[in-house]
Amino acid sequence: MIEEQITDFSNSIFQAAFKQYFQELGIIVSDWEDLFKQMNKDKETIAFIRYNNNNDCIGFIQVKSTIFSDDFFKEPYGFIRELWVNKKYRLCGHGAALMKLAEEYFYKNGIYKSILTTSTAPEFYKKLGYEFSFGCKAKNNDPVYIKQLKLIES
């Protein structure tokens, strides 16, 4: 099994997986090339992909660093943008492993809270230590979950 951090979303393994992910969600994209170009313009977003020796993508997680601030406070958060595991590999721990990669990345980069939205897998995220945030509202109206990150011993 291979795990790779990517910042270039023209990666063919990532692109094939992302297309499959959107297909599962029923999202139609008229110009994939433009979508991946737009992703590459966002220099704050990275992804981790997990694949086998046949370059079959097991899953990916796409994350972004963001800062919540006002006139008095400023706090960085790690935003879990997308998490997807290929149906063939679900329920085998790959989603949790991808989440761990993202959380370790955040922690090593001085980000100690992770935030995400989900309408499809709240129990999965709760098992990983995420808690529903009553005061935080997402623009997509999905429930928001936050986790205080701790140093992870490997």
Language model regions located:
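Conserved beta-strand in the GNAT
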Residues: 56-66, 79, 84
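A conserved beta-turn-beta hairpin within the catalytic core of GNAT-like acetyltransferases
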Residues: 66-80, 90, 139
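Conserved acetyl-CoA pyrophosphate-binding loop and the N-cap/start of the following alpha-helix
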Residues: 89, 93-101
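Conserved active-site alpha-helix within GNAT-family acetyltransferase domains
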Residues: 108, 112, 119-142
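Conserved beta-hairpin
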Residues: 45-61
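A short helix-loop-beta-strand connector motif used in the catalytic cores of GNAT acetyltransferases and
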Residues: 37-49, 79
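Short amphipathic alpha-helix that is part of the acyltransferase structural core
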Residues: 1-34, 47, 51, 154
